[in-house]
Amino acid sequence: MSIFRFKKFEVRNEKSAMKVNTDGVLLGAACPVRPDMKNVLDIGTGTGTIALMLAQRISALTQTTVSSIDLNIIGIDIDEDAAAEAGANFAASAWAGSLEARRQALAELSDDRAFDLIVSNPPYYDSSLTNPDAKKTAARHTDETGLSFREVLEFAGKHLAQEGIVSMVLPADQEASVLRHGRMNGLKLAEILRIRTVERKPSSRIIITFIHDNQTVTPTEKQLTIMNKGK
């Protein structure tokens, strides 16, 4: 049995094609949250790790007990096994009443609520290097088989609450493209966190956060180095 243990919850990591990984954990830990966030959507939830981290962080900011918190986090995934595993992980957590897992594609999501926070760790591998395992291909590749950040931004442009935010973790070389597609969907940059493994290397990942383009904000840039020493 594969179990990943966090400080306040555990994640079973057996069925989902996309396992617990550094990118997802960084997004769950670093994306902006506020205590007034009530409706949250995790697109491509996998094991549910990001959703669980957000439940922990948002609930910690409120003054209410876990059992009475007004928080609804939906994790969707197109893979049946992933959705089932996320659901089991949610049910075993302290925030079971605030978390819901659905086997559902983003295009099929009919929920008409406005989301205060939308997060995603979308696929990014080159589609020419597909894995023979179809489930892993869908989880890892941005093409017709899987989710793309373009879909996330298009959805966010229509379903983000007025003061809501959308945050994604992506390869650093996709920065220009994701900024362009954000603008195309009425979104503008609020924050970008550049992530590198060691100081001597360039950033390999970014956590990029957008808001509606009618909101007033001065974009911020931050740098995170994962290891203090290394090659």
Identify the function of each model-found stretch.
Residues 12, 74, 100-102, 190-193:
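General small-molecule cofactor/ligand-binding pocket signal
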Residues 27, 121, 152, 210:
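Residue-level signal for inorganic ion chemistry
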Residues 16, 20, 146-203:
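Conserved Class I SAM-dependent methyltransferase catalytic core
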Residues 122-151:
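Mobile active-site "lid"/loop adjacent to the S-adenosyl-L-methionine
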Residues 197-231:
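SAM/dcSAM-binding transferase cores
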Residues 29-131:
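Conserved SAM/SAH cofactor-binding pocket of Class I
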Residues 5, 67, 95, 183-186:
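Short, structurally constrained coil/turn elements
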Residues 2-39, 45-57, 206-209, 219-220, ...:
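SAM-dependent Rossmann-like transferase core, predominantly class I methyltransferases
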